[in-house]
Regions:
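Extended, helix-rich structural scaffolds rather than catalytic motifs
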Residues: 1-13, 50-210
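Short amphipathic alpha-helical segments enriched in hydrophobics
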Residues: 30, 46-49, 53
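Short, charged, low-complexity amphipathic alpha-helix
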Residues: 1-40
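Short amphipathic alpha-helical coiled-coil/interface segments
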Residues: 19, 35-49, 165-172
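Generic, well-ordered alpha-helical scaffold segments in large soluble proteins
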Residues: 22-25, 41, 45-48, 87, ...
Length: 210
């Protein structure tokens, strides 16, 4: 059993390393099509990692405990980025509680809100969110620099940027949710095929013994 766990852990580590590389490349590209393709592949690998961790936890619950962690959402657009973090967390089966605290030291003494999101769920799912969110946030920040619109400054420009963040967050949720469903379906198909093979082997053995 220990050897099996170590083997799965090694494969999971390889998946996570590749996800980091894909997301880093997605941050650096100016091509929307390439970025989307890289994010799509990263989502698939993150989903596969989740399946690996669930399989390990089914053998030993201590390998993936329920816990919580707090994430301070950085400015600018901290309130809007809670939507991105929340969508990632929801797609990866976490519960999120968001709180705000007035910080008078922000904005050169004018004050501002500190926004904190508290994530609840399995450790492996929290790790997946912690892996994805910083990279995807960086992608959004890079995209905001290219947001077009009639408003060049002021409230109108801020509204355009908030709309961009919301659209990006929505697309990420759909991509991750689809990857999760596809990974679970593939794992179920694999388990069904293995069960059928085992049953067929037993039937063959029974016939051979007659």
């Amino acid at each position: 059993m220990t050897e099996i766990i170590e083997d799965v852990r090694d494969k999971s580590a390889s998946k996570i390393d590749l996800v980091r590389k894909l997301l880093a490349k997605a941050e650096s590209t100016d091509s929307t099509a390439e970025r989307d393709a890289l994010n799509e592949r990263a989502s698939q690998l993150v989903a596969a990692y989740g399946i690996d961790e669930a399989m390990l936890a089914s053998q030993d619950e201590s390998l993936d405990k329920i816990t919580d962690v707090s994430v301070l959402l950085e400015r600018p657009f901290a309130v809007d980025f809670r939507g991105l973090l929340g969508n990632i967390a929801q797609a990866l089966h976490l519960k999120v509680v968001v709180s705000k605290r007035w910080n008078r030291d922000q904005n050169n003494g004018y004050g501002g809100w500190d926004v904190t999101a508290r994530l609840f769920g399995y450790e492996s799912d929290i790790r997946r969110v912690q892996l994805l969110y910083p990279h995807l946030r960086n992608q959004v920040l890079a995209g905001l620099a290219n947001v077009d619109g009639e408003a060049e400054y002021g409230p109108g420009q801020a509204a355009n940027k908030r709309a961009y963040i919301a659209g990006f967050a929505g697309a990420i949720y759909l991509r991750l949710n689809r990857a999760e469903k596809d990974a679970k379906a593939a794992e179920k198909a694999r388990e069904d095929a293995l069960r059928d093979q085992t049953l067929l082997a037993r039937v063959s053995d029974d016939h051979g013994a007659e």
